[in-house]
Design a protein with these regions (language model features):
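A short helix-loop-beta-strand connector motif used in the catalytic cores of GNAT acetyltransferases and
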Residues: 5-19
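Acyl-donor (CoA/ACP) binding surface of acyl/acetyltransferases
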Residues: 17-127
Length: 127
């Protein structure tokens, strides 16, 4: 997941990619990718965190801060979405805690390490 996130950051505005740190130690990252053209009212969010920090509420807080940042700095964005794997229950819970709702389940659309997975689409709308 970290590698795909890094690939996304290489194609993005560096101001939209933020480090997640604990005591000045990099433990993860979160980024927002505003879409263009007919999708310009949307932005995709991605994130990752080191496994030793899972379950501590850190990502939920980072997502909440990124949502506030995005809606505060991108007036045309009305929807932020994330696409966790269907079997990534922890990521689904984190998104739900941060106010995202499930919009879609796409069956067998992704492949990771040779395993075909469902893709979920979670989103939050501008209040």
């Amino acid at each position: 997941h970290g590698r795909s996130f890094i690939k996304m950051t290489e194609q993005n505005d560096p101001r939209n990619i933020l480090a997640i740190t604990v005591k000045n130690e990099l433990i993860g990252a979160i980024g927002i990718h505003p879409k263009t053209d007919i999708d310009r009212m949307n932005a995709e969010m991605g994130y990752w965190i080191a496994e030793t920090y899972w379950g501590k509420g850190i990502v939920t807080k980072a997502i909440e801060q990124m949502v506030a940042y995005t809606f505060g700095h991108f007036p045309d964005i009305t929807r932020i979405f994330a696409r966790p794997y269907g079997d990534n229950i922890a990521s689904q819970r984190v998104l739900e805690k941060a106010g995202f709702t499930l919009e879609a389940r796409l069956k067998a659309t992704l492949i990771k390490n040779g395993v075909i997975k469902d893709e979920l689409v979670y989103a939050v709308r501008r209040p």
